[in-house]
Amino acid sequence: MSFPYFISPEQAMRERSELARKGIARGRSVVALAYAGGVLFVAENPSRSLQKISELYDRVGFAAAGKFNEFDNLRRGGIQFADTRGYAYDRRDVTGRQLANVYAQTLGTIFTEQAKPYEVELCVAEVAHYGETKPPELYRITYDGSINDEPHFMVMGGTTESIANALKESYAENASLTDALGIAVAALRAGSADAAGSDQPTLGVASLEVAVLDANRPRRAFRRIIGSGLEALLREKDSKGSKGAQNPKGARDSKNSKSYGESTD
C-alpha cells in the first residue's frame, strides 16, 4: 500500500521563499535613494524597451527587480488602480503608502494561494506635493507580501549585500543629484565587481536606467534621465571625484546639479 506524498505547510513556505529569493537574486540590481530634490532610481539595465523603473501616478514612482513579466503586470495594475481612484475621488487621495499596501495584499495572496510565487521585489516611492516639505517615502514590498518603510535607500536584486554595504558607507542625506548618482553608481559597481570577482566594471549611459521623482516639479514629479542629460551628470560626477582626489579638503560644489537631465517623462 502506497502512502500519498505529504509536505508540511512550513516546508512548502520555505521552498516557495527559496524559489522567489533565487529568482530575484538572478536579476540585475536596482537602487533607490532619497536626495535633496526627491528620490533617485538607478538600475543596471542595458535594455531600452524593458524598463524596470516607472511612474505610477503624479508623485509616486515604481522600481522592481526579478521576473520582468511578473513585475510589469503588477506595474500596470498599480497604474490602473491609481488612475481609477484619482478619477473617482481626488488626485491627492492616491498615495505611495496606499499603492504599497495594494501590492502587499496582491503578493501575499499570490504567495499563499498560487502554486508558484512571484519572483519579484518592488519599491514604491513618493515625494511631497509641490510646495510641501514632507520627506520622501520609500516602501519595500517583497515576494510574500511583506512591506517595510525604508528611510534613506534600498537595494533590490543581484548582490544586494555588497551594494547595501557600499551605500551605508557612502550615503549622505540631502545630497545633490550629481552626488546621489555618484553614490548609487559606485555602489552598483561594487556589487558587479563582487559578483564577477574582478575589478569594478564600467557602468555608463548604455547600461544604466535612471529616473527621479523631482519634488520641485509642480504636478508630475517623475522624469527619466537619458542620453546627453545622463552623460553630462556622469561626466560631472567623474570630474568631481577626480577633483576630490586631488584636493580632498576642497569645498563641495553642487550649483550645477539641477541643470542636467531634463529629459522626457
Curated annotation (Swiss-Prot):
Q: Which UniProt keywords apply?
A: Cytoplasm, Proteasome
- Gene Ontology MF terms in the entry: threonine-type endopeptidase activity
Keyword Kinase appears in the UniProt entry: no
**What regulation of activity is recorded for this protein?**
The formation of the proteasomal ATPase ARC-20S proteasome complex, likely via the docking of the C-termini of ARC into the intersubunit pockets in the alpha-rings, may trigger opening of the gate for substrate entry. Interconversion between the open-gate and close-gate conformations leads to a dynamic regulation of the 20S proteasome proteolysis activity.
| GO BP term, example | modification-dependent protein catabolic process
Its localization reads:
Cytoplasm
Q: In which pathway does it act?
A: Protein degradation; proteasomal Pup-dependent pathway
Location of the region described as Disordered in the Swiss-Prot/TrEMBL record:
236-265
Origin superkingdom: Bacteria
What main location does UniProt list? cytoplasm
CDD domains the UniProt entry points to: proteasome_protease_HslV
GO cellular component terms, A-Z: cytoplasm; proteasome core complex, alpha-subunit complex
Function text: Component of the proteasome core, a large protease complex with broad specificity involved in protein degradation.
- SUBUNIT field: The 20S proteasome core is composed of 14 alpha and 14 beta subunits that assemble into four stacked heptameric rings, resulting in a barrel-shaped structure. The two inner rings, each composed of seven catalytic beta subunits, are sandwiched by two outer rings, each composed of seven alpha subunits. The catalytic chamber with the active sites is on the inside of the barrel. Has a gated structure, the ends of the cylinder being occluded by the N-termini of the alpha-subunits. Is capped by the proteasome-associated ATPase, ARC.
Q: Report what the protein is called.
A: Proteasome subunit alpha
Species lineage: Bacteria, Bacillati, Actinomycetota, Actinomycetes, Mycobacteriales
